[in-house]
Amino acid sequence: MTLISSVEHKKYIKISSGNYRVWAEWILDYEQYKYPEDLDMVSKLIVDNLEMKFCPPRYRDENMGNPLFGHCYHATQALYYFFKDTNLKAFAAPCKIAQQHWWVQDGDNIIDITAGQYEAFGIDPPYDKGKETKWYGWKNRPHRKSQNLMKLVQPSANLYFKQYEEKPKKVY
């Protein structure tokens, strides 16, 4: 049985202090993969579909010679959502080569599809400092980069924009 899921990146407008309304959202409808059977295949597909445009600008120079560098967050988030209904947990830790490093864990089993970036620096990923964490970003919503990467990995997925009202004007 195929499990269809959605990942929504909602756009909010502030109504009043602490009160927000969704005015639009990017939605990705996709098929979840089977864990752990499809883990190696999905990991390879994610790595094979990493593009420079997904890498934050501050990491792009280093990424030129180290193609996994700067991709841990969105690659890990994509992996997490492809296996959304499993027991995977998001982990992060401060690291020497960038601000944070991200991976997922299944119990004590570390699953880090961008760990290879550390080989160029001759150091190990900072798993010893890792803690289970929520995704960063407002309301822990998935990043658009993660949705775009997931669409590349699974071309049959449907990525679309749904607008509920006109784009609100910012009031300062």
Residue spans of the language-model regions?
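A structural boundary/capping signal
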Residues: 2-172
